Design a protein with these regions (language model features):
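Gly/lys/ser-thr-rich phosphate-binding loops in alpha/beta enzymes
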Residues: 72, 138-141, 145-147
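Aromatic side chains
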Residues: 107, 149-150, 176
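Transition-metal
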Residues: 1-124
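Double-stranded beta-helix
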Residues: 118-137, 163-178
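Conserved metal-binding segment of the jelly-roll/cupin
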Residues: 143-161, 170
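Conserved protein kinase catalytic core
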Residues: 93, 158, 173
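Fold-independent oxyanion-binding glycine-rich loops
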Residues: 87-88, 111, 152-154, 168
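Structural beta-strand/beta-sheet cores of well-ordered domains, especially the beta-sheet scaffolds
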Residues: 36, 82, 104, 147, ...
Length: 178
């Protein structure tokens, strides 16, 4: 039995979340600010449920029988800028967190005029100085609808105000805020 599965998403709220996913992308939820929808997830605290066909009502782990699914796919609605952050690589995550690392790919599904992301550190910065502000050392990149970015583990990054992003990432929720 092979057919396209429609999955129930997980809604996540945060102070920086917005209204676009709710109002323009028809993603209803109980939160005032909808920050993320996890469209494909097989995490211990979030497993999608099938909404259609013969498998309707079954959890995704029951359907594919794999609790270590490699990907997490989400939409992110940033009404405000997220904190500067970094994710661990697989080795560090396994040793310290007993999890996998987190590498991401962002597709800019929509962006307001002037939207930007933080994407690494400025050229010439070899070491983040504790004496200097992080904001002065990071690279800001203007974004527009249709842009895409690879965010390897270990790279400083942040989603800016006014960005709506489709994110494909390793199945990890490890984030270290800077």
């Amino acid at each position: 039995m092979v057919y396209p599965l429609k999955l129930k998403y997980f809604a996540k709220t945060a102070l920086w979340g917005g209204q676009t996913l709710k109002n323009e992308w028809n993603k209803p939820c109980e939160y005032d600010k909808l920050a993320e929808t996890w469209e494909l997830t097989l995490r211990p605290d979030a497993v999608n449920t099938v909404l259609n066909g013969e498998l309707a009502g079954k959890r995704l782990d029951e359907v594919i029988g794999n609790e270590k699914f490699p990907l997490l796919i989400k939409f992110i609605d940033a009404e405000d800028r997220l904190s500067v952050q970094v994710h661990p690589d697989d080795r560090f995550a396994a040793e310290v967190e007993n999890d996998v690392g987190k590498t991401e790919m962002w597709y800019i599904a929509d962006a307001r005029d002037g939207a930007e992301i933080i994407y690494g550190i400025k050229d010439g910065v070899t070491e983040l100085s504790c004496d200097a502000r992080i904001e002065e050392q990071v690279k800001r990149v203007s974004v527009k609808k249709g842009d895409s970015f690879f965010i390897p583990s270990g790279m400083l990054h942040a989603i800016g105000k006014g960005c709506l992003i489709a994110e494909i990432q390793q199945n990890s929720d490890l984030t270290y805020r800077v």
